[in-house]
């Protein structure tokens, strides 16, 4: 292979990596739209989404590990179990929060996770650079505008969204130190935990044919396909680029419900969200340490 051919091949891989990660972000961004179309109660939403996610992720793990499913789950270790528990909290809080506030509010709060992760890292001895404190301060101002502005979002929705973001930030910190933890089995186990928690509150009689399709789209499409595309793309491009491209989810999510359902975020929400996104982009661009590729709730 000539140098020119190798260069072209690397450029092609880089482009494919960007496309895969962008497709992951698009898949994740559909969560708010699908959830808004559901008529079932929140317990049924949680259990149904988790059940389909488990099926999809088990199939993915079986294919990726060439049938060694049990081996893959054993390999995640104690840290993988902790990650699964935190992801279960984050994933469950995500769906619950969508029932209390706008898609834009939930996703803008979710965008805080990388900045919060930098702060949580201090508890495991990671130094916090000045740029991180700047990003955190700006992000807090953005959240303050969203919460305290004239849009008056639900306090319950904002609080649950913050729980989602903090728990996901903890996942980022752990996976940054334990890059050997496989995210697919951990994500699958997290959905098993969500299913076990939500099952007593679920009512199968609430699920019609339309809701069944929507729950399948949430579980298999939004979670499963998103993780598959991320896994394919993250191998081909730098982690910092992955982190930036996945921010498409935060932009597209509110856009889908705005176009399809006329759920228009208020001016304060959009302004505050833009400030939060700006802080996260600043943190990602200026940080010399690449973040691990981690799928969101």
What is each residue range found by the language model?
Residues 1-48, 85, 89-93, 141, ...:
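Glycine-/small-residue-enriched transmembrane alpha-helix faces in small-molecule transporters
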Residues 2-7, 50, 247-297:
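C-terminal-most transmembrane helix of multi-pass membrane proteins
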Residues 57, 87, 131-148, 160, ...:
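Hydrophobic transmembrane alpha-helices of multi-pass small-molecule transport proteins
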Residues 29, 33, 51, 58, ...:
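Hydrophobic/small/kink-forming positions within alpha-helical transmembrane segments
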Residues 16-24, 68-95, 155-164, 199, ...:
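Loop-to-transmembrane-helix transition segments
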Residues 40-89, 116-120, 167-171, 187-203:
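Transmembrane alpha-helices of multi-pass small-molecule transport proteins
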Residues 106-112, 174-193, 223-259:
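Helix-helix packing/entry segments at the starts of transmembrane helices
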Residues 61, 96, 113-134, 251-271:
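C-terminal transmembrane-helix exit sites in multi-pass transporters
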């Amino acid at each position: 292979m000539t140098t020119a051919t190798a260069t072209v091949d690397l450029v092609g891989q880089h482009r494919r990596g960007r496309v895969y990660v962008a497709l992951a972000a698009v898949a994740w961004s559909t969560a708010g739209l699908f959830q808004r179309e559901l008529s079932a109660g929140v317990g049924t939403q949680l259990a149904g989404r988790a059940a389909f996610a488990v099926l999809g992720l088990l199939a993915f793990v079986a294919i990726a590990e060439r049938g060694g499913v049990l081996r893959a789950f054993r390999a995640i270790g104690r840290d993988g179990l902790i990650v699964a528990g935190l992801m279960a909290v984050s994933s469950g809080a995500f769906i619950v929060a969508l029932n209390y506030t706008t898609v834009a509010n939930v996703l803008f709060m979710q965008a805080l996770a990388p900045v919060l992760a930098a702060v949580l890292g201090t508890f495991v001895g990671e130094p916090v650079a000045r740029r991180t404190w700047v990003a955190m301060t700006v992000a807090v101002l953005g959240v303050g505008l969203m919460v305290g502005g004239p849009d008056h979002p639900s306090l319950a929705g904002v609080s649950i969204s913050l729980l989602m973001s903090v728990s996901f930030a903890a996942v980022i910190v752990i996976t940054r130190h334990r890059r050997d933890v496989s995210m697919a089995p951990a994500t699958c186990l997290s959905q098993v935990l969500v299913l076990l928690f939500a099952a007593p509150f679920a009512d199968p009689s609430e699920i019609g044919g339309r809701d069944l399709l929507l729950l399948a789209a949430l579980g298999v499409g939004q979670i499963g396909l998103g993780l598959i595309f991320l896994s394919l793309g993250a191998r081909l491009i730098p982690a910092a680029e992955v982190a930036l491209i996945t921010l498409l989810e935060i932009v597209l999510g509110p856009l889908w419900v705005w176009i399809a359902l006329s759920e228009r975020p208020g001016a304060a929400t959009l302004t505050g969200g833009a400030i939060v996104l700006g802080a996260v982009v600043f943190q990602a661009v200026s940080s010399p340490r690449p973040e691990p590729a981690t799928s969101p709730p």
